Amino acid sequence: MYKKLYLFIGLFILLVSLISCAKKESESNTSSTSIFKAVGYSGTILSSPDGITWTSSTWDSQNYGTSKNLSGITYGNSTYVAVGWYSTIISSSDGNTWTERNSGKSWDLSGVTYGNSTFVVVGWKGTIFTSSDGSSWEKRTSGTTRYLNGIAYGNGTFVVIGHATILTSSDGYSWENRNFEWNKPLSKPSNYFSGVTYGNNTYVAVGWSGRILTSPDGITWTEQVSGTSNNLENVIFENGSFLAVGYSGTILTSPDGISWTERNSGTLKNLNGVAYGNSIYVAVGYTGTILTSPDGVTWTERDSGISNYLSGVTFSR
């Protein structure tokens, strides 16, 4: 009788152990897919699992074997794609092992996004590339030779912004130039737009001299008052709000893209990229600067462990 009892207890303990191990493994696999990735100059790629503890030990500093500067990064279709100078395109399925892809050109690339089952990359001299998988790329005709800097997808439309340029496309292949009353002459720095996003049924584009444009459809654009003259580099819509970052530590928030409030970032360093995930905003910038915030209002500087220029950040969901 006691032998049967001991056997039952032993089997019960074994079963509990197996369930516990399976649960831990499942939690581990889940957390590994939700990661912040930041990119920067000299081929810098950084990782963080939570966006909160940004120390040199938590950051996993990687280099895929090149000194080329990286300008932007996105995540889609279970694939990371990062772009940079000299038409650099690299991709990874896990964020750890990266492969350089052949774009066939030598212009610098500035922005990348994923939408409508397509990766779209933009860059200097009107450069646009598309890919369905992040590996094989095709050059598209943009209809312009101006610099293209930022790209976003929303409401069935890609929107590209650049130097005195706004382009739209439904598929990433065929593009149409949209009219806007740019400052004269067109070469003025205030016509340089660098970031764009979509949210709350509105496209928002940000640029130098604190300029902000909004549009309901990507075609008709209206200028808004930002409240700053600092250059703005990037903008996102997350957690019900727009959030823009820029030079001298500038951070702006808005519920609708029209009314903007400047927030105290606690730094004067230029900020280039921003992302949101795990209920945390992460902004990156010059000299390895990383800031985090739970609400976009209160910001804390974190230790990246590096001094490289950071240009972009994304969160994999």
Where are these regions (language model features)?
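Bacterial N-terminal signal peptides that target proteins for export
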Residues: 1-8
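Bacterial Sec-dependent N-terminal signal peptides
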Residues: 2, 14-35
